[in-house]
């Protein structure tokens, strides 16, 4: 009979351990008040600045008429080939 009493106590102990461990984990995953609004606005601003820089660099390349392929000035060197 003693063995049958130990099994439910160990199960109850394990369940209580799991419940109490959730109390210790909750402070680490909490959300701070007000911080998310500032971070989202800052992120949006940085993304817009990056997008403007990309548009400017594309238009600069198109205006300068830089060829897409790199060519050597004298053509291929026949000695090396």
Swiss-Prot record:
Glycans are attached at residue 76. It comes from the Eukaryota. One of its GO terms (biological process) is cell differentiation. The modification Hydroxyproline is found at residues 73, 76. Keywords: Differentiation, Glycoprotein, Hydroxylation, Secreted, Signal. Residues 55-81 are annotated as: Disordered. GO terms for cellular component: extracellular region. Transmembrane segments: none annotated. The keyword Protein biosynthesis does not apply. The keyword Secreted applies. Residues 1-31 form the signal peptide. Residues 55-67 have a biased composition (Basic and acidic residues). Belongs to the CLV3/ESR signal peptide family. This is CLAVATA3/ESR (CLE)-related protein 12. It comes from Medicago truncatula.
């Amino acid at each position: 009979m003693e063995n049958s009493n130990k099994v439910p106590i160990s199960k109850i102990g394990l369940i209580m351990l799991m419940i109490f461990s959730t109390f210790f984990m909750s402070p680490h995953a909490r959300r701070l008040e007000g911080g998310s609004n500032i971070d989202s606005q800052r992120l949006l601003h940085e993304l817009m600045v990056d997008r403007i820089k990309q548009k400017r660099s594309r238009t600069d390349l198109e205006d300068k008429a830089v060829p897409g392929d790199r060519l050597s000035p004298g053509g291929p060197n026949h000695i090396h080939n």
